[in-house]
């Protein structure tokens, strides 16, 4: 531990063996709170490398139980959170709609830290059992193409270190790790990051973890694809990384103001979700979710481009099938 701390104090990247050792110790609670705080802050100041992030994620995954084997190329759109802008739950609503269109969505998430409502909070408020056992999860997934994996059930180190991390008043490597440690190991990911500078780093980490296709995005300071500003994207495709910017025009959608996406409480987010699924949501809410669903369709080769993905999603919403789909998820999650 002393050698690891000294390396970080001198702003040196840890090698694979050191990262694996460090996170194995963290998992087994062999690191004191003072040491953990020092490590997280030193990593933050140095800047976490994609290798440190990917090896840490691999170590955490090796110790996480896998609930079932799907035999499919699963998709996740979990983001880092931490943008502090308190918007509606764009990625969770997008995952519900995408799964109602047949995409195999294995949604990994937790409760809110910086927003009014995290993915787990929203789903729980909608009536979904967020702590499904493996049998319930597999059954729900097989019948709806949607499964929610509540992070604290699979990664105790996240749960136990949460109070300490909250007291640091800063984002740490744990924010980056959240979207990378889905126990079902999805091969396709739409991953939002709280800082544009992380896009390339996280795309490289996904590549190192064996993800086949991905898009890492930061839209106007949010960890989502947005329509009010430019979305910076790093796309993992054919084992290479493409870097580019997206605007509302790329989706053939009008721009909307960020303020229209912001909410005052969790109840507003829940109602916004229900309204969108019933195709009666505010245009500003619906269209930003549609842009994110379109990106999932594009990454999954279900749409040839983003504009086709938008058209497909808008047509699907007219059927109100996503709302009936949610009711089925709620029922099966408690079965």
From Swiss-Prot:
Cofactor: how bound: Binds 2 magnesium ions per monomer.
InterPro entries per the UniProt record, alphabetical: Anthranilate_Pribosyl_Tfrase, Glycosyl_Trfase_fam3, Glycosyl_Trfase_fam3_N_dom, Glycosyl_Trfase_fam3_N_dom_sf, Nuc_phospho_transferase
Binding site for anthranilate 1: 79
Residues annotated as binding Mg(2+) 2: 223-224
Pathway entry: Amino-acid biosynthesis; L-tryptophan biosynthesis; L-tryptophan from chorismate: step 2/5
Pfam families: Glycos_trans_3N (PF02885), Glycos_transf_3 (PF00591)
Gene Ontology biological-process annotations: L-tryptophan biosynthetic process
Binding annotation for anthranilate 2: 165
Gene Ontology cellular-component annotations: cytosol
Residues that coordinate or bind 5-phospho-alpha-D-ribose 1-diphosphate: 79, 82-83, 87, 89-92, 107-115, 119
Reactions the enzyme catalyzes: N-(5-phospho-beta-D-ribosyl)anthranilate + diphosphate = 5-phospho-alpha-D-ribose 1-diphosphate + anthranilate
SUPFAM superfamilies (alphabetical): Nucleoside phosphorylase/phosphoribosyltransferase catalytic domain, Nucleoside phosphorylase/phosphoribosyltransferase N-terminal domain
Protein name: Anthranilate phosphoribosyltransferase
Native source species: Helicobacter pylori (strain ATCC 700392 / 26695)
């Amino acid at each position: 531990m002393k050698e690891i701390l000294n390396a970080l104090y001198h702003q040196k990247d840890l090698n694979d063996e050191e990262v694996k050792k460090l996170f194995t110790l963290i998992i087994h609670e062999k690191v004191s709170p003072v040491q953990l705080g020092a490590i997280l802050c030193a990593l933050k100041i140095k800047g976490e490398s994609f290798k440190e992030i990917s090896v840490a994620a691999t170590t955490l995954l090796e110790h996480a139980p896998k609930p079932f084997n799907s035999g499919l190329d699963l998709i996740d759109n979990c983001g880092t959170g931490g943008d502090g802008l308190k918007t509606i739950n764009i990625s969770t609503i997008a995952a519900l709609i995408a799964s109602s269109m047949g995409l195999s969505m294995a949604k990994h998430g937790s409760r809110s830290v910086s927003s009014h409502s995290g993915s787990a909070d929203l789903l729980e408020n909608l009536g979904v059992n967020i702590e499904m056992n493996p049998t319930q999860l597999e059954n729900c997934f097989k019948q709806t193409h949607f499964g929610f994996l509540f992070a604290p059930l699979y990664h105790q180190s996240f749960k136990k270190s949460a109070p300490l991390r909250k007291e640091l008043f800063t984002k740490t490597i744990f924010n980056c790790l959240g979207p990378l440690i889905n126990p079902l190991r999805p091969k396709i990911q739409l991953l939002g990051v709280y800082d544009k500078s992380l896009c390339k780093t996280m795309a490289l980490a996904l590549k190192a973890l064996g993800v086949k296709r991905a898009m890492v995005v930061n839209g106007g300071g949010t960890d989502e694809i947005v329509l009010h500003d430019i979305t910076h994207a790093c796309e993992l495709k054919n084992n290479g990384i493409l870097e580019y910017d997206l605007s509302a025009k790329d989706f053939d959608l009008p721009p909307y103001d960020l303020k229209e996406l912001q909410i005052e409480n969790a109840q507003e987010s829940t109602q916004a979700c229900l309204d969108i699924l019933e195709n009666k949501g505010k245009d500003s809410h619906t269209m930003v979710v549609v842009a994110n669903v379109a990106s999932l369709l594009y990454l999954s080769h279900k749409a040839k481009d983003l504009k086709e993905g938008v058209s497909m999603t808008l047509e699907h919403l007219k059927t109100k099938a996503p709302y009936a789909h949610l009711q089925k998820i709620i029922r099966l999650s408690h079965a």
